[in-house]
Amino acid sequence: MSKKIDKKEQIGKSSINTKEAKHKADSQAGQIQNPIFEKNLQALFQQDEILAARLFAMGAQDKYEVFIGKDPLDINIIDRKSFKYIYENPIKDTHDMLESLEKQYKRYPIMYFYGLGNGILYKALLCNETHQRIVVVEPELEIIYIVLNLIDLSNELASERLTLFYSEFANYSQFYYLIAKVEFNRYAKLYDLHIHTDFYDNFADDYQRINQEFTKAISQMVASSGNSIDDMLIGIKNHIENLPTMITGYSYVDLVKKRHNLMDTAIIVATGPSLDKQLNTLKKFAPYATVISLDASYPILLKHGIKPDYVTSIERVVATSSFFKHKNKEFDKDIYFIVASLTHKQTIKNILPRRLVLTIRPQPSEFIFDLKKYGYLGIGHSTANQAYQLARVLGHKNIVLIGQDLAFAPDGKSHATGHAFAQAEEHLYTKAYGGEGEVRTTYVWDKFKNQFEKDIEESKKEDIATYNCTEGGARIEGAIEKPFLEVMNKLCKDKKVKNLPNINEVKEKTANRYLLQSYKVISEKIKIQELAKSKIEEVFLKVVPQIDNILKLRDEGKVTEKLFDKLVKISNQIDKVKEFIIKENYQKFLDSIVSISIYYQELELAKISVAPSDTAIEKVNKLIEWVEIHKYWLFSVAGGLNADIETTKKASRNLIKELKKRGLIEKSNLGKSKDNFRF
């Protein structure tokens, strides 16, 4: 468009009514007449069925006017009521945006935008193969409809290089699933939500909401990735130490198969301050519904004589074991204690001889054992999330939450009366139950809430209804908020007293097979990790003196272009060892420990990789930063592998002892661990 549009005068002259601009897309007898729209819709259907269906069903719209000039790139869209338009000059504005973005972000694999505009900018940006993924959130459905009728984005949508969200449908759960993908994870630190043009300032509140949801998703993803190698090693140690107890005990899969779809309603009992007022109602309805108690709730239920069917626990620390100190043989009869295999040995000691079901979490370090009979349960960091997932797996169609405050009570209490621990002081706020006002919460509780919201969103696809009957605390999006008594009167009407079948412990022959299988996995893991460690140490000893010399030159201001070839050679040596680590047959034993050892360094490397380097000296300086980070990268990986090797060897003693006792092996070939090793 060669000149600025005179808003009011041009309406009805050079404009094309939205209905006219989209006449090719009108559907007659279920057929799409516009081939561009048809191709786009078919591609979009693969990534967002709901949005595609909504667009397919749209008829004539009249909120926006479309202006098309002689140049096919000269497309503007105007709000008919406010006379606000997306571009001052479509061709120039798009060219300027493209030039500015490519100058600053041309090496960014992932980019985020608020506003689709006329779609041409994203078509142009994706000509740069470096941009692997572009995510666009558009607040106006009609604008999406217009663009998909005018611009062929079918290849970009089908390949998912362009991911398109309609703001009204977009939520935290969708963003989390996107961000959690490998190609997004590494570039988390590069997140920036660009506003397409000033036109989208009219949607400031929505932009802020979308930005917050993306930020929350990234934060949750980073938390889920784990940020402590010590925590991971404790988990590995506990899991391997507990293998004999898990394999010879009750099987999680056997339990689920035996009890699947036997009950419609599950009540998950947490220890929030609101639990006190729910106990009488819980006692009344416990015989007619599945009761899943969190570990911390168990002593409270024991005290009030309310018998749960399951008690869940996921923590690896010794403090959790205190919840199981008190035993009541009659009360505990037929209760299944569903506990993550990475729990502390004292927790196991305190629970036994009760019905203990150790379960494997869906983590790579536990997947390698291929013990499907004992897993998989426990995504997230909270036993409340574990309990919700258990309720879902058992086939319940109604899941009721009580005591799930995830916030401080008005009087400052963090847990129900009788709970063993108090929550540390923090000052974060979130939307209150009922949607009115805010309540004080903590960073950890907020992460638990995020996981709940993700699980609830997934459960809806299986027609599972989630009721938050806490009647206090924080709002959990996606859950139906109703009083506990009202919900239970409805769900338990005409229900009979439950009578759930039990299972036996795993047969000896099956246990023997899995014990030997675990031993072989550990043996192979140690062998591959030791090989990888030696290769990394070899490269480390070669390149670090060279890197240190180059860093010295940098500190002295003596960096020149002549260093380029030397830096490339160092970088290539590092790349070779990286290629070894990601070999398919090695990766399953290396990926977890390597990823957590260098996670934050990888985020820094991602920032370096996208930095501009147009001149020769810029390229040299960028490579210096690159190899400098890799010096610590190599050191961290070697250290992480060594810690995993020693932890695994030491933790395997229980397994070796059990194998020898059963006559399955005569001696171990795992090698001796360093008794004084500490992580």
Listing of model-derived features with the role each one plays in the protein:
Residues A25-M58, K63-P72, K103-Y108, Y112, ...:
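The AdoMet/dcAdoMet-binding core of the Class I SAM-like
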